A protein has these predicted regions:
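Extracytoplasmic
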Residues: 10-42, 119-123, 238-246
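Conserved MFS/SLC helix-loop-helix module at the cytosolic interface between two early adjacent transmembrane helices
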Residues: 60-102
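C-terminal ends and interior cores of transmembrane alpha-helices
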Residues: 83-98, 299-330
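Intracellular juxtamembrane helix-capping segments at the cytosolic ends
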Residues: 117-131, 348-364
């Protein structure tokens, strides 16, 4: 038994690497949006198209990825996802060589297919490699922490590589893209030569009984899918627009801040999400998902409204990385509004888990199908920031956060009212 556990150490390490890659590649459109705004003269709407291209892939691949997992198993699904991810990042690198915004968007779209497939496979695969139970859950939680660390590092790294505004080109981000392709290549090589248990492959000939009901038969689940849709958009839109606000020139309504400093501030948002998840894990056993969701949604609305009405010339000190004079950290002055946007990371950190728990409560045998539909609704991470970018073009960056306020208000409604199961008459055993 000991030997078998040791034999899984390497694939487990590769799963952790893939957890890192999910956040790293998913987070790239934020700093890349700053780059394309400068290099291609993209509007705020256009600069968010990277997120749209990345997340809209979930709408196409969410359900097929789940079917693929059942048909061919963990290993082949993971290897396929890694291959697609390598190609997607490679296309983004190529976009810098040919100076093409369209090629960049194609790369982001292909990368989105990979991220959807990886999100489908890494959690159950890591749980299986850990032997299930507490050990499997422990590995998943550790993987989630690595995911948060990657989300923190991405804007900081690319922001540092960007340097001064005049030199913001995709080519400057090449070291980050090479790192991503290198990790993908290493993970592929390791997983290709390692045996992995496949407990959940479903034979093609298996006959499925027809069921008159499904997850969409439950009102609280339908409303929950909308909540997930807007949640992912909120999680992405808050830091992404803040990054644009800080880095864009004064003539475009921005603050013309150093990209490395802005990246560090945005990185703090993702770091606070890690802190929030750890706190959520501690209190989760004592506090209901409904109460937790209600509290964090209310707090997020308070933070957002304060940020919107705070004058931009009112500043506060925050720790940040500087690109001038080499790699260094220092306290820098940032608008108080930005600080409150960053604090929203504490609130968004526990929203996914809370919404998921509320939406699948009472679904019983329909829970697996519900998970696949949830993955489809992740596409909200590409659509809501696009809407926010459009509003920013028509008004200004700060005013665009009213889009986020409306989305969070819906999540508060879902926590207090929409999450109640009114279809308890449906048999779910």
């Amino acid at each position: 038994m000991t030997t078998e556990k040791k034999s899984y150490a390497l694939p487990i390490a590769m799963m952790f690497a893939l957890f890192f890659m999910i956040a790293f590649v998913t987070g790239l459109p934020s700093p890349m949006g700053v780059i394309v705004a400068k290099q291609f003269g993209a509007t705020n709407f256009q600069s968010q198209l990277g997120f749209f291209a990345n997340f809209i892939a979930y709408a196409f691949m969410g359900i097929p990825a789940g079917i693929m997992l059942k048909r061919v198993g963990y290993k082949k699904t993971a290897l396929s996802a890694i291959t697609v991810g390598f190609i997607g990042v490679g296309i983004q690198f190529l976009s810098g060589e040919v100076q093409s915004f369209t090629v960049y968007l194609i790369g982001a779209f292909v990368s989105g297919f990979s991220m959807c497939m990886l999100n489908t496979v890494v959690n159950p695969m890591l749980n299986t490699l850990g032997g299930g139970g507490n050990k499997g859950n422990q590995l998943i939680q550790f993987g989630g922490s690595i995911n948060s660390i990657a989300a923190t590092i991405t804007p900081m790294l690319v922001g540092y590589l960007m340097g001064a505004e005049a030199g913001r080109t995709i080519e400057k981000a090449n070291p980050a893209l090479f790192l991503a392709m290198g990790i993908f290549a290493l993970a592929f090589i390791v997983l290709a030569f390692v045996k992995i248990p496949e407990p959940h492959i479903v034979p093609k000939a298996q006959i499925k009984e027809k069921d008159p009901h499904g997850p969409m038969s439950f009102r609280h689940f339908i409303l929950g899918t909308i909540a997930i849709f807007v949640y992912v958009g909120v999680e992405i839109g808050i830091p992404s627009t803040a990054n644009l606000l800080m880095t864009q020139p004064l003539t475009n309504g921005g603050l013309a801040m150093d990209a490395a400093i802005a990246g560090s501030v945005v990185g703090t948002y993702w770091l606070l999400m890690l802190v929030g998840r750890l706190l959520g894990a501690v209190v989760g056993a004592k506090v209901s998902s409904r109460l937790m969701m209600g509290v964090v949604s209310s707090l997020a609305i308070v933070f957002l409204v304060i940020a919107i009405f705070c004058p931009l010339d009112l500043t506060v000190s925050m720790p940040a990385m500087q690109s001038e004079g080499g790699f260094s950290f220092a306290l820098v002055q940032v608008p108080l509004s930005v600080m409150f946007f960053v604090l929203c990371g504490l609130c968004t950190s526990v929203m996914w888990g809370s919404i998921f728990n509320l939406a699948v409560e009472g679904l019983g045998k329909y829970t697996a199908a519900a998970s696949g539909l949830f993955m489809v609704m992740v596409c909200g991470g590409g659509i809501l920031p696009l809407i926010q970018g459009f509003v920013a073009d028509k008004t200004d960056y700060i005013s665009s956060y009213w889009v986020i306020v409306v989305a969070v208000a819906y999540m508060l409604f879902y926590a207090l009212i929409g999450s109640k199961n009114v279809n308890k008459n449906i048999v779910t055993d």
